[in-house]
Amino acid sequence: RFAKVIADVRKDSTVKAVVLRVNSPGGSVLASEKIKAEIDLIQKRGIPVIASYGDYAASGGYWISANCDKIYSNATTLTGSIGVFSMIPDISGTLKDKVHVNITPVNSNKHADMYGMMRPLDQAELDYMQASVENIYEKFTGLVAEGRDMTVPAVDEIAQGRVWTGAEALAIGLVDEIGTIEDAITYAASAIDGVR
């Protein structure tokens, strides 16, 4: 939904700058990547995108905004959480032990019920999930490195799922300024001064 709103902004020829208000503790990689892709397209049109952080700019919230032209954060904004996790619930024990229901799976192949929650994952499935999480983490640290003009090892040093206050994020290079949304709007206006 939010990606569509940004796409509509991108298609509006009267837009000269965008202030992106981020107030998110995170979300799915797919949704974050869709939103980031739309922001990238806005920037390719030469339109500055300035981020303004509210209470949170963590995980997916940071993913979508790391490449903004300028990032404003409140001193206490929870920022970063550059990390990835995945989980697949296993309710088989609860069904058997508490509800006294046994499950008999019938599958087309060994891994067809991997996401079915009715059994624990086997080692091959755990290895697959771990590789997937590590691949996404590598992408995340790479896009942060590009957006914040840092090296991937420098990002990894401050990432690993940790959360920083806005003031700490400023000190380590994850944001550019401590300021309010009004500061971000003022900066956006100055960035387009004279642009028609």
Where are these regions (language model features)?
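Amphipathic alpha-helical substructures
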Residues: 149-179
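Small-residue-centered hinge/linker elements
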Residues: 1-49, 56-147, 195-196
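C-terminal intrinsically disordered, low-complexity extensions immediately downstream
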Residues: 186-196
